[in-house]
Amino acid sequence: MQKYDLHLCEIDGGNLHNAIPREAHAVCAVPMKDKESVRVDLNIYLSEVENEFAVTEPNLVMELESESPCAEVMQQDAMKNFLHSIYAVHNGVYAMSQDIPGLVETSSNLASIKQRDGKLVVVTSQRSSILSSRKDMSQMVSSAFLLGGAEVTTGDGYPGWKPNPSSEILQVSVESYKRLFATEPKIKAIHAGLECGLFLEKY
């Protein structure tokens, strides 16, 4: 973006707000004189990214193709603000649980980017077993886009559910399992959006 006179024509990625996006694509325009230089630089970058994530994302595929000329491009200042915000916003694990080793406590997901009625609509989702941490993460994400001049709306979300190894319902479940199967159950926790937080809030 800084080296070339690049213009964003189209971008689309992700679908559901509560799912990690699987694929995305973007169409960009550059002056014809820079076409080959851009191709070389991008291919080098794509190779570096694929090597960086070779272990954690062995099936990662990044492709560069020629496209037909764009009929319209995104306004330059808006494009720069958008790209800076996307680059700045946190995406992925933010904090691990202090109670259960290996359990993600707080995360943020850059779920989707869509073009609707001449606007770019970005959807993110924050999860945490601690409500205050989820709110803090949500505010951090909002700030990244507000600094880029975007309009930000926030949904109600759902309450967190901090694991309690000493809870009565867990002890009852453990004893029932042992009585039925004559063996100790394995107690585990997951990082996901569950109804349990709503139950805990009421009962």
Where are these regions (language model features)?
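Midchain, well-structured core segments that form catalytic/ion-binding scaffolds
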Residues: 1-127
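Generic non-transmembrane alpha-helical segments
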Residues: 1-4, 37, 41-52, 140-148, ...
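General N-terminal targeting signals
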Residues: 23-25, 127, 139-141, 169, ...
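An extended, acidic, His-containing surface patch that forms the Zn2+-binding/catalytic region
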Residues: 63-109, 114-117, 131-136, 146, ...
